[in-house]
């Protein structure tokens, strides 16, 4: 058979075999097409390549285009098998005058025919051809060669068929398909649009695996798409808006793409658009805000105007969607707008290096207030049957972000919604596994198939903690929260989260949000200790909380990098101990002694004597561990000193325990070794408070202080109360 015959067989074979995409016009059954049966028999009995080629040619003549059905296709496969197409794909010895690609084209055409059967598309003999097929996508050749184009089409048909099988995407990614598709798209050769379509499908099916296997190539595609987006002047810019979110990496968007993406979005959103044109742009902007914060927006006038435009559009969309009862809500668009509103909240509350000027902040806060009012209006209408829907979770999230920064406005509406928020948080807390799934659904709904990051925490209560911290300071909201059972829920939540930090858990892999959530819980409890002490005394959940604080602090104060959490736990425990001083658990039990020893360690290690050049006397200075976080720590430290002072007369065993720790002696020694001028008045007052109560509570403490030059030190620092106490017998 000549080269021309081979080519003809390939092309004619394609005409018949590839007709599987069409609906069968006739059902070629055995009894109705004896000619086909005879040719299939010849194909089965062929003894060499030439006979197989000839038989294939006869089969294609017997089966007209559009006549082939799945059964006939399978019988052709049974006659040909995989051995022959395998040889065609890998042979390096073509007949004289016949280009190699003619043989490969026929091999790919046969595979494409077989892959029309889903069972064959997942066959190992097809899967092991993936690397070979990928080479055809990137091979150089004559762009006008019809045979080569046909082979590329068949290659994409094979890969697309494999992608449609249950485990197909995984096999394609492992076989290097993602890189090959990226290179084929970037080369803009024949079929590059098919490469992009298949890439989109693989990213949608297995995004994480795609990025793991081919990150450099995918980033190159992202750069190319971003440049196209920035330059696009026609309708393609709207198509790119829908494509680009899929190509944003799960970690950080490359800075070199920021300018193009922002410029393209600015041009779209700055125009008068219909909703179908605007919504993909809002979703892309939300995806960028989720991944990059405001880093993708340029500094300066243009950037601030663009950010203001984004937030304005988002707020308008939210109000239009949520204020009208009975209106169908486009939840994916509104959730994207929530992400843009959250970006606006962050920028409006940023003191340094904010993109916005003060007048812009004032204007945006007013606009966002109206949108948050619409969110509250929506949540007030949510029935129990909808509480597990992802969109409700997203709505609670944006409300939580607002309440974390602003509780003075919309006070009446917020108070009206508080009972719902407590019930909602309790429902998701009690079904923690489903709540985590809701968080995943929110990420899918809002932005892209990307796995949620820190921006989408897995429980509703954590979203509400900052706002509740502010609200527990106010009488009205606090009474509602107490009435609805929020304190008991918070105690349970704190104990559950604390388990994640206990021995046996790897705290190094804990997200920061867990520790921040624990600290915020402590702040809420501190507010309740001060404003509702009766609640602490009567609610049994606080007894359980106190027990956990006592058993946990000794190990916590020893852990590097967790000083701020230790400060919260120590201060909260000391304040609660004053209210629960009659509890059996605080009567000198091992747990209570361990807790107070750890609290003394926290309070006593805050300051040290530091030598100063050119001076004989040292100065009082912060310890290295405390110095970097003192701005966040100092209020807790002073409150802890005050609380410890209040515990001394209530717990008779505490003063002797403090004496055994040598804290009073070391404190006087520290004060005696530094210049009094280096000790601020508030520090003097805090130290004197502790020393006076210890001296009053225990004779041995007074004697130890006198031996440590306590009276002289008290005189130097004008501690009149301490000086008088030590002068007494």
UniProtKB/Swiss-Prot annotation:
Belongs to the neurochondrin family. The modification Phosphoserine is found at residues 2, 448. A lipid is attached at residues 3-4 (S-palmitoyl cysteine). It is found in: Cytoplasm, Cytosol; Endosome membrane; Cell projection, Dendrite; Postsynapse. The lineage of its organism: Eukaryota, Metazoa, Chordata, Craniata, Vertebrata. SUPFAM superfamilies: ARM repeat (SSF48371). It comes from Rattus norvegicus. Transmembrane segments: none annotated. It is a lipid-anchor. The modification Asymmetric dimethylarginine is found at residue 75. This is Neurochondrin.
């Amino acid at each position: 058979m000549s080269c021309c015959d081979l080519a003809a067989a390939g092309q004619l074979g394609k005409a018949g075999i590839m007709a599987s995409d069409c609906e069968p016009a006739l059902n070629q059954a055995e009894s109705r097409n004896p000619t086909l049966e005879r040719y299939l028999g010849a194909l089965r009995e062929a003894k060499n390549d030439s006979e197989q080629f000839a038989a294939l040619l006869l089969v294609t003549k017997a089966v007209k285009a559009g006549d082939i059905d799945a059964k006939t296709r399978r019988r052709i496969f049974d006659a040909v098998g995989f051995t022959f197409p395998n040889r065609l794909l890998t042979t390096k010895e073509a007949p004289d005058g016949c280009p190699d690609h003619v043989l490969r084209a026929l091999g790919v055409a046969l595979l494409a025919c077989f892959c029309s059967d889903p069972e064959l598309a997942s066959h190992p003999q097809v899967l092991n051809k993936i690397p070979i097929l990928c080479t055809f996508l990137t091979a150089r050749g004559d762009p006008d060669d019809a045979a080569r184009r046909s082979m590329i089409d068949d290659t994409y048909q094979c890969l697309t068929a494999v992608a449609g099988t249950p485990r197909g995407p995984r096999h394609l990614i492992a076989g290097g398909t993602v890189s090959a598709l990226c290179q084929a798209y970037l080369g803009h050769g024949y079929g590059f649009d098919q490469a992009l379509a298949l890439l989109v499908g693989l990213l949608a099916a297995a995004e994480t695996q795609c990025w793991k296997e081919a990150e450099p190539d995918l980033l190159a595609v992202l750069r190319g798409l971003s440049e196209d987006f920035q330059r696009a002047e026609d309708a393609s810019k709207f198509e790119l808006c829908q494509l680009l979110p899929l190509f944003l990496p799960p970690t950080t968007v490359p800075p070199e793409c920021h300018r193009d993406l922002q410029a393209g979005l600015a041009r779209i959103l700055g125009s008068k658009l219909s909703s179908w044109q605007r919504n993909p742009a809002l979703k892309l902007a939300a995806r960028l805000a989720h991944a990059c914060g405001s880093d993708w927006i340029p500094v300066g006038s243009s950037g601030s105007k663009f950010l203001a435009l984004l937030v304005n559009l988002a707020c308008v969309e939210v109000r239009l969607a949520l204020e009208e009862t009975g209106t169908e809500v486009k939840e994916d668009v509104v959730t994207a707008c929530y992400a843009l509103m959250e970006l606006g909240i962050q920028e409006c509350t940023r003191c340094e290096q904010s993109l916005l000027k003060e007048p812009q902040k004032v204007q945006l806060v007013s606009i966002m207030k109206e949108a948050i009012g619409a969110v509250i209006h929506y949540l007030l209408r949510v029935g129990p049957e909808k509480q597990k829907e992802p969109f409700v979770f997203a709505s609670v999230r944006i409300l939580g972000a607002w309440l974390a920064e602003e509780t003075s406005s919309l006070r009446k509406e917020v108070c009206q919604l508080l009972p719902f928020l407590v019930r909602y948080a309790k429902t998701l807390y009690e079904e923690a596994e489903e709540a985590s799934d809701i968080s995943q659904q929110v990420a899918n709904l809002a932005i892209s198939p990307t796995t949620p990051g820190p921006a989408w925490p897995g429980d509703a209560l954590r979203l509400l903690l900052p706002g509740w911290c502010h609200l527990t300071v106010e009488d009205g909201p606090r009474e509602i929260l107490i009435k609805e059972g929020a304190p008991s829920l918070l105690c349970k939540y704190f104990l559950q989260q604390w388990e994640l930090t206990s021995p046996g858990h790897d705290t190094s892999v804990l997200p920061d949000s867990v520790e921040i959530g624990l600290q915020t819980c402590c702040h809420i409890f501190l507010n309740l200790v001060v404003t509702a002490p009766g609640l602490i005394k009567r609610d049994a959940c606080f007894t359980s909380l106190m027990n956990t604080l006592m058993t946990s602090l000794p190990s916590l104060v020893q852990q590097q990098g967790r000083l701020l959490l230790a400060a919260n736990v120590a201060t909260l425990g000391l304040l609660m101990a004053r209210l629960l001083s009659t509890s059996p658990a605080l009567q000198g039990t091992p747990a209570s002694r361990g807790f107070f020893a750890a609290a003394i360690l926290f309070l006593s290690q805050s300051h040290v004597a530091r030598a100063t050049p050119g001076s004989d006397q040292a100065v009082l200075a912060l310890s290295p561990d405390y110095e970097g976080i003192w701005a966040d720590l100092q209020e807790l430290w002073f409150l802890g000193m005050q609380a410890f002072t209040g515990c001394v007369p209530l717990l008779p065993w505490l003063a002797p325990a403090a004496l055994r720790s040598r804290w009073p002696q070391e404190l006087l020694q520290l004060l005696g070794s530094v210049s009094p001028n280096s000790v601020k008045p508030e520090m003097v007052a805090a130290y004197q408070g502790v020393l006076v109560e210890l001296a009053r509570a225990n004779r041995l403490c007074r004697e130890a202080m006198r031996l440590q030059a306590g009276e002289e030190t008290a005189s130097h620092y004008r501690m009149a109360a301490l000086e008088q106490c030590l002068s007494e017998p």
